[in-house]
Amino acid sequence: MNYNIEGEPLPVVICNLEANETMITEKGAMSWMTPNMKMETTSNGGIGKMFGRAFSGESMFQNRYTSMGGPGMIAFASCFPGCIRPFQIAPGQEIIAQKSAFLASTSGVELSVFFQKRIGAGFFGGEGFIMQRLSGNGLAFLEFDGHIKEYELAPGQQLVIDTGYLAAMTGSCQLEIQTVPGIKNVVFGGEGLFNTVVTGPGRVWLQSMPVSQLAGAIRPFIPTGNYSYITG
């Protein structure tokens, strides 16, 4: 399988498959494909993994697209302005990603639930108690909001991240929550009560425009039920 990622900031990944190669995706992620791509909806791992995907923000079922009788093509477009990034997954090299980041993968990649070790990280970190874990062996495509900045953290090196900007990290990183010090900072700083702290070793991917931040910015401009139009 080979691929091209085109069209940022409204990207699409176009995958060209050999005969009998398979791509796995979430419900509704397919954008266009050749007629010989056969779709099969599956639980892909049984009841346990179905509910694990549901808890991590994904659909309980997944779609498998297989190229039948020869080469085929299938495309997956991002649902929000941002970028699509490829991740090579290998045994022992997991990727932990924000909820709803998974777009598509080859058949060797497993998507499961990731429980943060420190419960406070889930309740106060802004991205929920559960994240996504990608493991196995294959190629995965993740979609992120806005521009992506990557950092390589040395052992013990830390990065303090505002809520929602953590897009993904390698499984070797540790995640915890740090309280913003000082009542004045909390009340007047406008940055909330907590920050996410990621500790290396490992790689971290940050996104520049989390959809939650964008929603908060435009919410004051959305008409409510009491809004009335002036007509002539």
Which residue ranges define each predicted feature?
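Composition-driven recognition of glycine/serine/threonine/acidic- and proline-rich low-complexity segments
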Residues: 1-232
